Amino acid sequence: MKNSLIMTICMAAALTMTACSSNDAQRAAEDMLVKAEKYFNEGSYDRAKIAIDSLRKVYPGAVETRKKALRLFQNISLKEAQEDLALTDSILQRVTLDYKYIKDKVEKDKAALRATPDELELLTRTKMKLDSLKVRFDMQCAKIKYIHKKQKE
């Protein structure tokens, strides 16, 4: 009887200590998440991702906080992809105009038999740059679509 009472008291004490440390860990994880959100709102996406990564490594048991951190990570990735898409789009428009201008000039020079190797090389390089930008644009669109799909799950 005495042993079972001592055992019960020890278990209750251990359970209480675990609950307290769990609450402290949960609070610390929440603080880390708030810090990551602050970085995100300031536009420091890399710092926000690092904070989220640290949260996941240091507090693996803070499941609810980690779920919130995952949503924040998705928002960060989405924002980065949208900004990169906007930049890629503006560069793509400029390079498209450059390519059309160079192509028209080279075609006129070819017709007049005045096309130089430098002009032809410039046309080829501009076309390669244009194709590369189109691929990048398509990849960013696909990434944004994928992130939206994951956010709905």
Predicted features by range, described:
Residues Q74-D98:
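Alpha-helical linker/edge segments of TPR/alpha-solenoid repeat scaffolds
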Residues S21-K68, E80:
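Start-of-domain marker
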Residues T16-A19:
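C-terminal motif of bacterial Sec signal peptides marking the signal peptidase cleavage site
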Residues R56, T96-K103, K110-L113, P117:
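A conserved position within tetratricopeptide repeats
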Residues P60-K68, D84, L97-D104:
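Boundary/linker segments of alpha-helical solenoid repeat arrays
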Residues A62-Q82, A111, E119-K129:
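TPR/TPR-like alpha-solenoid helical repeat scaffolds
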Residues M1-M7:
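Bacterial N-terminal signal peptides that target proteins for export
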